[in-house]
């Protein structure tokens, strides 16, 4: 059984409340999800193909990520999820926060810059089926093919706010 902390809309932890994966999140409460875009120091981005058995199966995604466990910070969750799904680590920068009322989720968005060998990506059984590295223009051109673009849009906004649309 996976347990989550409960948060209000402003990402304040609600003490004394524990959420359980698979159970409905009560009105006015949210659970935390961290998503990570991975950029290699050579400028390419990691894409992963979702396992065919998952929701949006066989689609490509530009993020690793998942729900934060009880007691986990957004950054700790991002690091754990990236390591579990890819075997990679690197330097993390928080690039955004997205509240999704329909999912009762708060998405903490991160950019991870890594210098790991690009051939060392380790796929997580049951989660991912393939991976590939693509340049910025290719990433932008694939938006319609991606399972989710939420974190990608946070990345674009982060780049624009820092005067660089290709950070």
Predicted features by range, described:
Residues 1-35, 41:
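Acidic, metal-coordinating catalytic segment for phosphate/diphosphate chemistry
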Residues 13, 58, 70, 99-167:
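Nudix hydrolase/Nudix homology domain
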Residues 19-20, 51, 74, 147:
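Residue-level structural signal for beta-strand termini and adjacent loop
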Residues 21-24, 95-100:
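Short, solvent-exposed loop/turn elements at beta->coil junctions and helix N-caps
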Residues 25-27, 56-61, 132:
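A short, polar/proline- and glycine-enriched secondary-structure boundary/capping micro-motif
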Residues 33-64:
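A glycine-rich, hydrophobic loop/mini-helix early in the fold
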Residues 46-47, 62-95:
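The catalytic Nudix box helix
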